[in-house]
């Protein structure tokens, strides 16, 4: 199955693009997308454990199952005042 990946802020800078697409086996989870992105872009690895996950525009947990055509977003922590 194919899913669209959206990357924000520092994650976008690491990858060099705000979006990507990945192919995964049926039954894959949001976490599997993150693992695939790390394999493609190893500089994403230090962000593990600090990012938020969204599936089809709603925050979700990393174990959420995916379907073909889903949109997964990875968001780094936000700071500021």
Describe each PLM feature range.
Residues 1-80:
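Ubiquitin-like/PB1-type beta-grasp interaction modules and other compact soluble beta-rich domains
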């Amino acid at each position: 199955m194919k899913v669209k990946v959206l990357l924000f802020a520092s994650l976008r800078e690491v990858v060099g693009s705000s979006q990507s697409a990945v192919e995964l086996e049926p039954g894959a989870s949001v976490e599997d997308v993150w693992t695939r992105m790390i394999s493609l872009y190893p500089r994403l690895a230090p962000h593990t454990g600090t990012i938020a996950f969204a599936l089809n525009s709603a925050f979700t947990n990393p174990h959420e199952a995916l379907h073909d055509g889903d949109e997964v977003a990875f968001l780094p922590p936000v700071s500021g005042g």
